[in-house]
Amino acid sequence: MEGVRVPIACALILLAISSITSASIVEHTFNVQNLTVSRLCKRQVITVVNGSLPGPTIRVKEGDSLVIHVLNHSPHNITIHWHGIFHKLTVWADGPSMITQCPIQPGQRYAYRFNITGQEGTLWWHAHASFLRATVYGALVIRPKSGHSYPFPKPHKEVPILFGEWWNTDVVALEEAAIATGVPPNNSDAYTINGRPGNLYPCSKDRMFSLNVVKGKRYLLRIINAAMNIQLFFKIANHRLTVVAADAVYTAPYVTDVIVIAPGQTIDALLFADQSVDTSYYMAAHPYASAPAVPFPNTTTRGVIHYGGASKTGRSKPVLMPKLPSFFDTLTAYRFYSNLTALVNGPHWVPVPRYVDEEMLVTIGLGLEACADNTTCPKFSASMSNHSFVLPKKLSILEAVFHDVKGIFTADFPDQPPVKFDYTNPNVTQTNPGLLFTQKSTSAKILKFNTTVEVVLQNHALIAAESHPMHLHGFNFHVLAQGFGNYDPSRDRSKLNLVDPQSRNTLAVPVGGWAVIRFTANNPGAWIFHCHIDVHLPFGLGMIFVVKNGPTKSTTLPPPPPDLPKC
């Protein structure tokens, strides 16, 4: 059933029940199925939810609980990840394949059950098994609970803006070929706004997102980068935007004419409709290519904003196009990413923990896989601190943790890189080529409950310096500082913002640079930390944080639900 609300007392099977009397259970059914569509002059079979691209928008209030029945009618294994949801004691619903569950096989089903606590804003959901995320995704909107309001002017309307990528090919086969050959997949054929490429692409004149506005009104744009592998610049001609939230955490208002958004990230921005009604205005997005030497699709998607009350007809109105930054404008990207700050004392604001229990320095980037007999070489690999992550095949990591099953993962992820070197020097492998090769493993870092962890994420340039959007499941983290070059504690500790840093679940670590993040491990379970450039995770750019149970029942992981899929 779709969008049903019932009193929360009727659902005693939920693992956590809100004490707020106005809270509800919001229940949906996701039918995962194949669909034949026409895009870019070609008919293509894709996998979608409920027959649409993007899939349905889930709307809840803070304090609600969600039950999503996923029925897999597709020919592919599937899982759904609820990107950015904390999943306090509901980690069995987090969704990454072989991390918290085995995939839902064709013809099978699974009910994701979780509560929405301490979060407001824009999140999203997507497939977390193979490249199906290219077409299996949608928005997850969390509004304040009844009687509470936004900490900014009430908008006239809320508008989801989801960026995507489109391939004129079978995306599952595309990923399988990339993994087999160790070569990145072909670039996408188009970018999309709400599933529509826009009129700069072939056979797409009438396939453009359109937004009608009323002059003098405010609109809340809920912007989501669901693109697979590309960070994006986004602008609206003749309009400025006020950022009020990032990754479902309120920010101090930040006025800008350009949004920069990495795969996995969300931005809430207010648009004030204050321009001439006799002109229309394109919204447009194109790549921020942090690694100029790496091929990327240098095309542009666009939608259009029309004002009501115009004296001219739609066909005769001029349409203005925004001037987007250069594809390689790292300074504009860095300025946007680093200028966001927290809305101190706003709803659900969490101060920075001042005392750190665990310190880690983690290198991230691409390398090469050592050649085995009868294999194609060289293959690209990716790693965190030279550990190239491999998904288990027999049992999910969370089940192994809960049932204490040995041999599924190793608890040896290091606090420091095994070899220290000049991380951002692109010529370092000329004298030490062995740095290029990574070891395959399924490595985890074990954390005691309530441990405060500080992680320095250090990009390296062994293959190509690149900005990696790093996503942590189950937590938000404070972004204390960012910079370029090699992190130097004697120089860079003074840059830490301990007062009002932004909190995120996905951070684009600067190209050829570093970032310092801090979080408290108060959520028991197995949580993957990985690059959200989708081709990089199967190459190995990930690791696991296993957070142990706390001392009480309310801090102890419950057993798996009876319908948890089997491998």
UniProtKB/Swiss-Prot annotation:
Main location group: secreted
Residues annotated for Cu cation 1 binding in this entry: H81, H471
An annotated GO cellular component: apoplast
Gene3D superfamilies found in the cross-reference section: Cupredoxins - blue copper proteins (2.60.40.420)
Reaction catalyzed: 4 hydroquinone + O2 = 4 benzosemiquinone + 2 H2O
GO molecular function: copper ion binding; hydroquinone:oxygen oxidoreductase activity
Residues at which Cu cation 3 binds: H128, H473, H530
Keyword annotations of the record: Apoplast, Copper, Glycoprotein, Lignin degradation, Metal-binding, Oxidoreductase, Repeat, Secreted, Signal
Cofactor: Cu cation
Gene Ontology biological process terms from the UniProt entry: lignin catabolic process
Domain of life assignment: Eukaryota
Binding locations of Cu cation 4: H468, C531, H536
Disulfide bonds: none
Expressing tissues: Predominantly expressed in tissues other than the inflorescence stem.
Cofactor binding summary note: Binds 4 Cu cations per monomer.
Glycosylation: residue positions: N34, N50, N77, N115, N186, N298, N339, N374, N386, N427, N450
Assigned EC number: 1.10.3.2
CDD domains the UniProt entry points to: CuRO_1_LCC_plant, CuRO_2_LCC_plant
Keyword Signal: yes
Amino acids binding Cu cation 2: H83, H126, H532
UniProt keyword Glycoprotein present: yes
Family as reported in the entry's similarity comment: Belongs to the multicopper oxidase family.
Protein's job: Lignin degradation and detoxification of lignin-derived products.
Protein name: Laccase-7
Annotated source species: Arabidopsis thaliana (Mouse-ear cress)
Gene: LAC7
